[in-house]
Amino acid sequence: MKLTFNIDYRTNWGEQVFMTGNIPELGHFDRAKALPLISEGSGLHSVSLDISPATGSIEYRYFIVRDGNPIREEWGKNRVLRIDPKVGSVTVNDRWQDQPWNKPFFSTAFTDCICRPAAYDQPCDIQPGSICLMADAPMVLPGTRLAVSGSCEALGNWDPAKAVVMNNSMFPRWSVQLPLADLPQTDIEYKFLLLRESDHTVIGWDNRDNRILSVPESDGYSSLVEAGLFFENPLSPWRGAGVAIPVFSLRSDKDFGVGDFLDLKLMVDWAASTGQKMIQLLPVNDTTMTHTWADSYPYNANSCFALHPMYLRVQDLGELSDRHEQSRFDALARTLNELREVDYERVNAAKTEFTRLIFAQQGRNDLETPEFKKFFDANASWLKPYAAFCVLRDLYHTADPSAWEQYSVYAPSLIERFVDQHRNEIDYIYYIQFHLDRQLREVRDYAHSRGVALKGDIPIGISRTSVDAWISPRLFNLDCSAGAPPDDFSVMGQNWGLPTYNWEEMAKDGFAWWKARFRKMAEYFDAYRIDHVLGFFRIWQIPSNALHGLLGVFNRALPMSPDEMKYGYDFHIDTESQTRPFITDQMLGDFFGELADEVRATYLQHTGYGRYQLLDRFSTQRRIADHFASSPRDEKADRICNGLLSLVDEVLFIEDPYEKGKYHPRIAAQFTYAYRALNEYERGCYDRLYNDFFYHRNNDFWREKALWKLPPIIDATDMLVCAEDLGMIPACVPDVMHRLEILSLEIQRMPKDPSVKFADTWHYPYLSVCTTSTHDMGGIRQWWEENRESIGSFYNNVLGFSGEAPYFAEPWICSRIVDNHLKSPSMLCILPLQDWLSTDGVLRRQDPREEQINVPANSRHYWRYRMHLTLEQLLQADSFNRSISHMIAESGR
């Protein structure tokens, strides 16, 4: 069989088009054996090859080479040809696959869920003597089909009733085969169109000029393929609605005191019944470190691959043969499920006790099944070290590997022996993860069948006491912490206590760790939220001896030298005084009041001229905290401790951790006493330096860093990419997100335009997710009651009502706010369940303060919110559900 490939691509001088594929003639995807195409002029490149007729499916792709190095890749999946062995020759006319303008629609959120065909056609091989048209059309909703019509009888002579329906077996790629014998030997015009499947009513025609097809003569054996076509959808951009709820917050009649994975099937039912297309979750990875409620923080996982045992529906594993024990657990489950909030410690202890008993009773049988062996083989690379980590954590009563004696440094051979020596405990961990995986896959498949996509959450950080940091410490900067600059959530900034990433080390293997992490997530989810996407541009990095986020710097950034400050901004830095805490008598009175003299005598050293410095043993925030942690705490001790911690923040500059002798201006330095001590001219020079550094100087540098990291990572899967892009946003961020077609996050009360108080929902970008609130803030009702000073303006100027704003956010107010969001241009409107419920005066919770999931300013917050009604009750709330369905439909979603 002879294959001829043609592709239009205008190369620059010195560039050449190559192709590679899964057959020997194309090098088995080995770039060193790729096939060069010959330039035929006018941008056309061609190559012909002879292959065996029994080759089967052929996968291939093109790439561009300059000076022997690949410089450009095609976007998307490999091209696929299925050719009947009886075909003598095939000519394939390809188009270069660039990233399409509607890339999100090619994600599995659409191809496997929202636009998933009700049924797939049988694959059809390219037949002898035919023309095959292949067109990409992802945004074809269930119940509709792509068809082709044109200027000849075989294409219906432009009569839609006679249009040829295309094959969807490779959806979102559609194909149709037309016998050459049925086509006139001339140029014909044609167009793609959307038809309603039930009656072939036309929904819309290709939004472009007629296409031209040159029909060759037929010899009965040769075929032509026109590939790389693209349906220009004439319909309005698709917009959908969804709900956000953590798994632990779900409540059903079958729960064990906490939401579990199988509860999600009921949430899928509710979403589907009300016209919603997406369910957004918080991270579901295992966070067990101490077996206390402190482990409830879902962004501090002990593994980026393992699922949290808390989310296992333990009743699904079977019943205990000991009827007395089974009855005891049934009663305990009912007791825990009646609690208003999650009792993290009791729930996890009870589930662990039950699963250990059921494992002892029948778990070995599960570990002998083909399903388990398949699971183990696919996940062994992370599962074995994770299981060893869990056993070592419990054996040494700490998750800190540095306390694990000979196991503190991960050594594969040593861990293999440890696994063999603790086989029963290790197998129990395998057993739990196997069933968690099985249950979450069951939910994913069920969601697909209902046309609902599951959206996961990718935390920006990993725990320093995690499997990932233990086995691959080179990938992380373990001597510092990630966090965030000051914002509306925390005036001191945030210190998450998580290590930052060593991106240079990660890049050496093509970001393999990140790709594996995303691919694991893609086994369960079809969309994801990148937590703090700004961290891919630069991360706020805090030294290990600091506690407050105020002492952080951006990693990486372009720090300033003293000469640059002097000659560029006329600011003369005093590195001796302006990089160390600025402490004066006046400050001590302001910070400590009547305790100032005691503080001077105990913690400070006088350096002359009314200035002080902290004694060496109190010179860092870590040393101060450690000192007070070892002594009795009372109100006085707290005042002194907090005051000393704030004194350490009193600097104007912070030395760069990588380029010594160069400096970063301290974030929010204008609020320091050190800044006030400058004269007016110095403050003006400092402000110019500060504003240039944080808002202009690093933009191109950060853009380059993001475009180095993000494309290979997000292209590792076909999930829909959304991002949390709140906070101190560099000017380069919107451009990069638009270029990569990452959906932004839009929150009305956190506008990205600093000149306005509230964002305008009518002007949100299409590529965005809009929401009324997030897990880090109170819902509509709580915000309304706690922000009286701004609610009046919102009530009159945003909602359009006159008069004084009601004290409470009544259901009609919440409905107006929700309706405004639904009618926004955003592709997705995903609202917390609490805010959906706020529109119903009967169903909503009495006290909205009980609905806040997290308080970011409190690093010790207990994550325990649960919905106050069951999912079964929610599904039966007919009036409310009709109202939600109506609001969504009326908004055009």
Describe the role of every protein-language-model region.
Residues K86-V87, L229:
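Acidic/polar low-complexity flexible segments
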